[in-house]
């Protein structure tokens, strides 16, 4: 990596959150404007301390092949929604390609990987063998709390507009595994196996 300092943005999360929280109409120009301004804002806010922006993007997940219930409630919610989610995702994907082709940001989009996988891998890569490089994660996803075990990894939540902190990230990760994750459709360890 040429510049190990990085601001890693959870692209799909910021794009979808913008559409949903702003109650945006499905307008390509408006969604593009929102996504680009959001990225620009975080670049300006954190670049001095954390360097280059890296945009981590979702692809279809290998997890659904292993566990079909993974995020099934989200799919069901979208099906019941009046919003044209196919069009929203088409626009988000198109803007991702435009950013990759025309902007100075690094865009990482890996087949069968979610942004979570990319972010976790990048963080571990920057922390291995005593590198301990500063990393800022832009995401409201609490799954990233487990990465806070590295002292120089910070997380900023666009939803709450504040830093995400936890006094014991290792304990949080253990509890998260044991309790499951209802938002992702992952059962706790006591649930019957399918």
Could you tell me what each predicted segment is?
Residues 2-3, 49-50, 76-194:
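Extended two-metal-dependent nuclease catalytic cores across DNA- and RNA-processing enzymes
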Residues 1-98:
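Domain-level signal for Mg2+-assisted phosphodiester chemistry and nucleotide/NA-binding surfaces
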């Amino acid at each position: 990596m040429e510049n190990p300092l990085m601001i890693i943005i959870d692209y799909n999360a910021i794009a979808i959150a913008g559409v949903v929280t702003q109650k945006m109409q499905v307008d390509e120009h408006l969604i593009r404007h929102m996504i680009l301004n959001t990225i620009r804002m975080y670049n300006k806010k954190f670049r001095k301390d954390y360097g280059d922006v890296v945009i981590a993007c979702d692809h279809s997940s290998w997890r659904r092949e292993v566990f079909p219930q993974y995020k099934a409630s989200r799919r069901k919610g979208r099906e019941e929604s009046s919003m044209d989610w196919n069009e929203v995702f088409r626009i988000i994907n198109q803007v991702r390609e435009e950013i990759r082709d025309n902007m100075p940001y690094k865009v990482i989009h890996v087949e069968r990987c979610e942004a979570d996988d990319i972010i976790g891998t990048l963080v571990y890569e920057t922390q291995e063998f005593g590198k301990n490089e500063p990393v800022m994660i832009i995401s409201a996803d609490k799954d990233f709390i487990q990465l806070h075990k590295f002292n120089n990894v910070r997380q900023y939540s666009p939803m709450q507009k504040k830093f995400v902190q936890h006094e014991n990230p290792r304990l949080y990760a253990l509890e998260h595994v044991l309790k499951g994750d209802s938002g992702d459709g992952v059962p706790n360890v006591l649930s019957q196996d399918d």
